[in-house]
């Protein structure tokens, strides 16, 4: 691979993920983004899917430089963003791109996603950020095609900026580029939860459990991320950090507290 510290413009892009530094998605993404500028990769040293916005506070972190501009951190995606911005990068990045995730990050599931959380952390630090996911769990998905989409979105962000308190959640169908439908700006969808705990017994008679054994069923509503992706559109959802339910403020203000 090309050394990631070299690029063709003065833009500096930081890349991270939650699937780990050796995942094919992050390798395809980092290579593709080189056409926009200098790329530094700071990613977990192993799988950290569903880590959410967790931050390591009660243990030391270790960093391993695998090659120039390519760092593995024994922490979460949020740890990686902090380490990159505050310690490893020589300059403050112009953009943080998290991905390419193995599997979509849609609807309510973004609250679990380490991929989305990394972009959220960058947004908290005032840095434009994009989370990118491919709708496949296979290692041989169309990551190169997804990386091309990520570059197009990143170029728009670097050129035009983003509205205040906004980062992007991009979900890409797993198909060749010529089979993708035009990108759509979408809203976050919802799903019907089918939460299930599977309990088993090991050979020594002790119980163990698996969480989340069934695929989620998303509500296929027009305008949502799921609806777009299900029809092979690239879904681009603008997200922000304010979780306040403003309509509920009016209702709760009438409580006799």
Residue ranges and their predicted role:
Residues 13, 24-87, 91-92:
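A cross-family phosphate/adenosyl-ligand binding-site feature
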Residues 16, 42-44, 74, 98-101, ...:
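Short beta-strand segments
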Residues 95:
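Short, Asp-centered acidic motifs that coordinate Mg2+ and/or phosphate
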Residues 123-145:
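Glycine-rich phosphate/pyrophosphate-binding loops
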Residues 104-113:
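Glycine/threonine-rich flexible loop motifs
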Residues 84-90, 117-128:
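Alpha-helix C-terminal capping segments
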Residues 1-10:
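Short, Lys/Arg-enriched N-terminal segments with co-localized hydrophobic residues
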């Amino acid at each position: 691979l090309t050394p990631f510290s070299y690029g063709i413009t003065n833009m500096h892009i930081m890349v991270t993920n939650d699937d780990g530094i050796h995942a094919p998605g992050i390798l395809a993404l980092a290579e593709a983004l080189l056409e926009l500028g200098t790329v530094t990769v700071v990613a977990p040293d192993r799988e950290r899917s569903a880590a959410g916005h967790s931050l390591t506070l009660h243990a030391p972190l270790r960093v391993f430089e695998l090659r120039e501009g390519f760092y593995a951190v024994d922490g979460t995606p949020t740890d990686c963003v902090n380490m990159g911005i505050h310690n490893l990068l020589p300059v403050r990045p112009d953009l943080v791109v998290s991905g390419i995730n193995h599997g979509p990050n849609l609807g309510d599931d973004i609250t679990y996603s380490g991929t989305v959380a990394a972009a959220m952390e960058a947004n908290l630090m005032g840095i434009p950020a994009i989370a990118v996911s491919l709708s496949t769990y296979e290692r041989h998905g169309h990551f190169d095609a997804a990386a091309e989409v990520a570059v197009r979105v990143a170029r728009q962000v670097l050129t035009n900026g983003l509205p205040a308190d906004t980062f992007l959640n991009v979900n890409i169908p797993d198909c060749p580029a010529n089979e993708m439908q035009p990108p759509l700006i979408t809203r976050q969808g919802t799903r019907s939860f089918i939460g299930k705990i599977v309990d088993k017994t090991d050979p020594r008679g002790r119980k163990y459990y698996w969480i989340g054994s069934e695929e989620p069923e998303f509500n296929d509503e027009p305008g949502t991320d799921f609806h777009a992706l299900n029809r092979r559109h690239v879904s681009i959802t603008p997200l922000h950090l304010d979780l306040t339910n403003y309509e509920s403020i009016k209702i709760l203000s009438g409580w006799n507290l």
